[in-house]
Amino acid sequence: MSEAEARPTNFIRQIIDEDLASGKHTTIHTRFPPEPNGYLHIGHAKSICLNFGIAQDYQGLCNLRFDDTNPVKEDIEYVDSIKNDVEWLGFHWAGNVCYSSDYFDQLHAYAVELITKGLAYVDELTPDQIREYRGTLKEPGKNSPFRDRSVEENLALFEKMRTGGFEEGKACLRAKIDMASPFIVMRDPVLYRIKFAEHHQTGNKWCIYPMYDFTHCISDALEGITHSLCTLEFQDNRRLYDWVLDNITIPVHPRQYEFSRLNLEYTVMSKRKLNLLVTDKHVEGWDDPRMPTISGLRRRGYTAASIREFCKRIGVTKQDNTIEMASLESCIREDLNENAPRAMAVIDPVKLVIENYPQGESEMVTMPNHPNKPEMGSREVPFSGEIWIDRADFREEANKQYKRLVMGKEVRLRNAYVVKAERVEKDAEGNITTIFCTYDADTLSKDPADGRKVKGVIHWVSAAHALPVEIRLYDRLFSVPNPGAAEDFLSVINPESLVIKQGYAEPSLQNAVAGKAYQFEREGYFCLDSRYTTADKRVFNRTVGLRDTWAKAGE
């Protein structure tokens, strides 16, 4: 298959192919323009993969541009986080990072040009009055009483705005379009508002700041963007995008194209709702492993490759739809099944004593790091007469479907011996505290010599060599597929979204590094946590289970 055939295809790429074939463009130039007022989430990853992926596939350029026109909500912390997320996903922007604030002087000059042409005016209605005058979808708006000021008066008032002569909310600059337009976005939209706030890039140079719709199209044009890709909620805004560029003296007129945003089950994408989760401490921060933020997914153990694969699979369309969480989980599960080394950890431990094993002795058992990849090598794991097994791997009585350890029957310890359960000890409440077994010394990594069949295999950790670990079992943050539709989305938070266990792991995991994934055999995929791990305490996060347990629960 050729490189071109291997590329994903969608309506945007078809437009680009036509533009290149017709000679309309010879180089493709896209951009990713986040506002630095929060952390990026999986929905932004779709836009990142689309814009940077197109530039990559067509040997073009993609800018990273911060839409930093509201200093009240923005912070350099978010700028740094966004840059880190884009790079972590595996993409690189063209040249230096761009900022809309880089163009404040040009934007101001274009605003003056619109005033000079009689296409913009300074309005002194209050924000509430502007909303009232705007009308509704069924009713046209009303002209502001300040709409017909002369060009000279508007120029003087706009300069007064710029030099701090008005208080916040007392004046704004509006485009003069059509208050009866069927599209509310075209009813004399605000182009500039007053904000006495220090900007993280320009300091206190400005006290007037341009609105998104005015800034976005001009920034695209100044950067030579050929295809401006936005999500569907900006579809009506395209009319204003084109109006601004049609009415100023600028040589380049990019085109805006809209695609559906990413909606994902069992989570929320609204910045307001995500912020509420953080500020009300329902989660521990923006990088909480249950959050849909890129930093949260990264801390949970998701790989950049799995997120890119997910964005590739869901594709790009004009139709809004909701993607199953299982689709995202299958991407990371497939990635880690292929690439994660194996290790053993016992999450809910109970002691197993092998009574006929040489007392006080131990031995090393060789285990492959990956069952299907000999090139990943092997490791030596200590084995002894006292081990930890998972409590769920033993029953005093069980039916034939239970393939683990049962009283009076045998089971294989992974890559070690066959053991037989002989008796148990219990505490005062009747809980099993110790399982006593015997072992067949001739079954190290081989079948019993007499040909008897031992079907079950369980994992284990040598008690004398065990590494105490905290294991954080993360699950879906919400208990319903569409929490955003709930009357109170906080009421449907999954109470089991985080369960903390104290367990034991094989000693090789002492050398685990944050972010590196492992398959804990028979348990799932885990990675060392970057926040809570210390030299004395190893904390592992569950990235995803070995299979989709939610699908079974929903049947």
Swiss-Prot record:
Write down the NCBIfam families for this protein, in alphabetical order.
Answer: glnS (TIGR00440), PRK14703.1 (NF011291)
Q: What high-level taxonomic lineage is stated for the organism? A: Bacteria, Pseudomonadati, Pseudomonadota, Gammaproteobacteria, Enterobacterales
Main EC class the enzyme belongs to: ligase
Please provide the record's keywords in A-Z order: Aminoacyl-tRNA synthetase, ATP-binding, Cytoplasm, Ligase, Nucleotide-binding, Protein biosynthesis
* Species of provenance: Citrobacter koseri (strain ATCC BAA-895 / CDC 4225-83 / SGSC4696)
The entry describes its oligomerization and partners as: Monomer.
SUPFAM superfamilies found in the cross-reference section: Nucleotidylyl transferase, Ribosomal protein L25-like
Q: Which domain of life is it from?
A: Bacteria
Q: What is this protein called?
A: Glutamine--tRNA ligase
Question: Which processes are annotated in GO (biological process)?
Answer: glutaminyl-tRNA aminoacylation; glutamyl-tRNA aminoacylation
